[in-house]
């Protein structure tokens, strides 16, 4: 095994910015960007279809991110098996994975990455639910002291922001009908 350095990018939505929205949790801002847990999935991209070679869970204490500074970068290292083959590295954040088996085709693995939430999304509390994210990158091989940067993470949720600029009208409640209680983490 080889320790691989990773750097993820969590992009802000331009309008409105993450700083102006309500999901702030407690103590720090920009909780929509927070990465609390990471799983690394390594697929053999030299074969068709690509198959799962390795699954590594990253310890949460090894994830570095400064949300108070508005940084959208997440840094950590993970032990990966060396490989001379072309691989696709998928990063899954904030979603508990289970039951993945080596040799499973990539599409089957991605189709099994489903996040379920049966009730209201906890967005503004001590125990808020971090948004599941997915990103991937292909690399020619995994060799000693490799560093993999700029993996762009995509949030699994769509957000509806309501803006009311009038002073004589107050929105008291908003309801979303026919919403899903589960969804795919991967956009693929």
What are these regions (language model features)?
Residues 1-188:
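Sec-type signal peptide cleavage vicinity
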